[in-house]
Amino acid sequence: MKVSVLITLAVLGVMFLLTSAEERGSDQMDSPAWLKSMEIIFQSEERECRWMFGGCTTDSDCCEHLGCRWEKPSWCAWDGTFRK
């Protein structure tokens, strides 16, 4: 839910910037710095651990008690441990 709200806000922000740039008659938008700051928000969401059957490249990509299976395509699976 949090991700969908952030995506919606990002889309609305980009639409606002596009329409305001058109109204000013400007061909150059001053939004690349703003878009790069939004990129950081989405990277923080993507850096969360991967759940069961999520794609992975190393064991550290997967959540606790999951490990990366190396079959193609790679995916997170239970590593046989239990929570204490």
Curated annotation (Swiss-Prot):
InterPro entries: Huwentoxin-1 (IPR011696). SUPFAM superfamilies: omega toxin-like. Expressed by the venom gland. The keyword Secreted applies. Residues 22-48 form a propeptide. Keywords: Disulfide bond, Ion channel impairing toxin, Knottin, Secreted, Signal, Toxin. GO terms for molecular function: ion channel inhibitor activity; toxin activity. Disulfide bonds join C49-C63, C56-C68, C62-C76. GO terms for cellular component: extracellular region. The keyword Disulfide bond applies. It is found in: Secreted. It comes from the Eukaryota. Residues 1-21 form the signal peptide. The presence of a 'disulfide through disulfide knot' structurally defines this protein as a knottin. Probable ion channel inhibitor. Belongs to the neurotoxin 10 (Hwtx-1) family. 06 (F4b) subfamily. This is U2-theraphotoxin-Cg1b 2. It comes from Chilobrachys guangxiensis.
